């Protein structure tokens, strides 16, 4: 997974002070209450009396765009707001690191989770003669490479996606290797070697008594011998 910020929970203490008398000592005169907090914030206490420290905890956040809010501390008819902000991050967490196809050809899915606004994908030139890319699928909706994801779900959370790649049958006796590029990152694709093929024509020869030369045609995808 690639992320540009840490995703651990963070707690910040908010100090709440009482009034101060003429010699500088705190005077515990007023009760306080914390109100109007964002739903994603947890407070260790929402009310108390006098000088206090309250832990303000933000949970793991997987959105791409930051979020903000505030909490309000009230003492009698006095109010003070504390601004709260949590940074977003770019998340790219793929469950597929490579794709391996059988010799007869098949379709396989490249899957993962991300919060990007769009995803680019393509078959590289070293595999373009035998591999094709389908559509990007997010929540049953299909998208072309680079198209914006409807509703931008990644702004506030990760979403799952899949891209289907289809390999044609391998007509050679060699393993085929190439690459796909998804979100600017290269991933390896391979295909098992195909079966050897052989066709000979004609399959019988008849020669004149005086002798003559005739030809047979050999069609194959690998080395051959005659015995």
Which stretches of residues belong to each language-model region?
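Short beta-strand segments
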Residues: 78-82, 92, 108, 185-187, ...
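Solvent-exposed, low-complexity, repeat-rich "mucin-like" stalks and linkers
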Residues: 1-33, 90-125, 196-226
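Short strand-coil-strand connectors
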Residues: 37, 74-78, 115, 124, ...
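Surface-exposed, short loops/turns at beta-strand junctions within beta-sandwich domains
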Residues: 60-66, 157-159, 168-175
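Surface-exposed binding patches on compact interaction domains or structured appendages
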Residues: 24-55, 93-94, 116-164, 222-227
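A short beta-strand micro-motif common to beta-rich folds, especially ectodomain repeats
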Residues: 14, 54, 64-77, 163, ...
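Interdomain boundary/hinge segments at the C-termini of tandem beta-sandwich modules
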Residues: 82-89, 189-195
């Amino acid at each position: 997974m690639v992320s540009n910020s840490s995703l651990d929970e963070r707690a910040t203490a908010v100090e709440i002070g009482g009034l101060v008398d003429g010699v500088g000592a705190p005077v515990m005169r007023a009760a306080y209450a914390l109100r109007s907090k964002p739903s994603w914030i947890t407070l260790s206490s929402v009310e108390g009396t006098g000088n206090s420290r309250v832990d303000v905890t933000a949970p793991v956040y997987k959105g791409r765009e930051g979020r903000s809010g505030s909490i309000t501390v009230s003492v009698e008819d006095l109010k003070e707001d504390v601004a709260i902000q949590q940074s977003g991050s770019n998340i790219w967490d793929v469950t597929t690191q490579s794709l391996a196809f059988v010799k007869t050809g098949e379709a396989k899915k490249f899957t993962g989770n991300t919060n990007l606004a769009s995803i680019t994908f393509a078959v590289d030139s070293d595999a373009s003669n035998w591999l094709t890319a389908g559509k990007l699928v997010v929540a049953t909706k299909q998208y072309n490479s680079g198209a914006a994801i409807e509703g931008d779900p990644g702004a506030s959370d990760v979403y799952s996606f899949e891209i289907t790649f289809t390999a044609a049958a391998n007509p050679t006796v060699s393993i085929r290797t190439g690459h796909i590029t998804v979100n600017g990152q290269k991933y390896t694709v391979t295909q098992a070697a195909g079966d050897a093929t052989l066709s000979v024509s004609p399959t019988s020869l008849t020669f004149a008594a005086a002798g003559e030369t005739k030809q047979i045609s050999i069609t194959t995808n690998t080395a051959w011998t005659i015995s």
